[in-house]
Amino acid sequence: MNIEDFDYHLPESLIAQTPLKNRDQSRLLVLSKDTGELTHLHFRDVIHYFEPGDTLVLNDTRVMPARLFGLKEETGAKVEMLMLTQIEGNDWEVLLKPAKRIKKGHRLNFGDGKIVAECIEELEQGGRIMRLHYEGILQERLDELGEMPLPPYIKERLDDPDRYQTVYAKESGSAAAPTAGLHFTDDLLNKIKQKGVHIAFITLHVGLGTFRPVSVENIDDHEMHSEYYQMTQETADLLNKTKESGKRVISVGTTSTRTLETIRRDHPQFVATSGWTDIFIYPGFEFKAIDGLITNFHLPKSTLVMLVSAFSNKKYILNAYHKAVEMEYRFFSFGDAMLII
């Protein structure tokens, strides 16, 4: 399959730069995955598509204020560090700008020494493994010194960093938000529960690989980035019970989907587990975990467009995207949502 098969034209003016005042006032495009029929609603209306006994799966990861600005100890040169993934202990994979002159053994100083990062390994494309030295709790140091990392297509500064977190964000570790969840309010979640719909949580820490463009023409040759995930016994039991009773598992976001499908690929049922997934979902993939998907509108030629095309089909997805462009839906992280069911 060719990468060009997943392209569409998107006017830059439709890339949402700021969130709407109210999370659930975004628009919702409902796509029947089997017929391609489209329905235009608002996100708060999503509750009408849930039935008692269904389970809604949310990713409770929390975005770290992981962009740090500091100085190179040896020269005093300014440097920017974006923390991506915790490797082990205090060792982190990071992106540096500028990276060229940061070699193994060099040290970076942030906040007058409140965080010191020592380079222990050089990677490709500006990547490094850095060993962090700090006093106290890392999250507290990051809250004090760090800024929220926003996707490269968002050019405006975010007035309220909490708007790039879901209302249920809990487990710190992501470099980007699981954006399908940004539309939910506490009130909407309570109404969903009152309807008899179960709420379950998984954790997948989103890396910047989610924004990395596919660089090969044949998508079979693409190598996915790895991301850390975990599922509790409580969630596994609830999902197994949902499936056994003939009810539906509705996944909120591609991150939840990748977690659920990874676990069901590797096990005959849902189990409590954790690990790293590089699952690549594209047309031809056999879904074993999810029955519905809530997701935002994704970048042209991205692996996420491929994932939603696999869940419905490419023709229906591209038709929905063209209709969304025509009707001036808002796209990407702060944009509108789709329900594919």
From Swiss-Prot:
S-adenosyl-L-methionine is among the record's keywords: yes
Keywords: Cytoplasm, Queuosine biosynthesis, S-adenosyl-L-methionine, Transferase
One Pfam family per UniProt: Queuosine_synth
Localization (cell): Cytoplasm
GO CC aspect terms: cytoplasm
Pathway named in the protein's UniProt entry: tRNA modification; tRNA-queuosine biosynthesis
EC numbers for this chain: 2.4.99.17
Any one GO biological process: queuosine biosynthetic process
Principal EC category: transferase
HAMAP family: QueA (MF_00113)
Function: Transfers and isomerizes the ribose moiety from AdoMet to the 7-aminomethyl group of 7-deazaguanine (preQ1-tRNA) to give epoxyqueuosine (oQ-tRNA).
Family named by the database record: Belongs to the QueA family.
Stated name of the protein: S-adenosylmethionine:tRNA ribosyltransferase-isomerase
Source organism per UniProt: Staphylococcus epidermidis (strain ATCC 12228 / FDA PCI 1200)
Organism classification: Bacteria, Bacillati, Bacillota, Bacilli, Bacillales
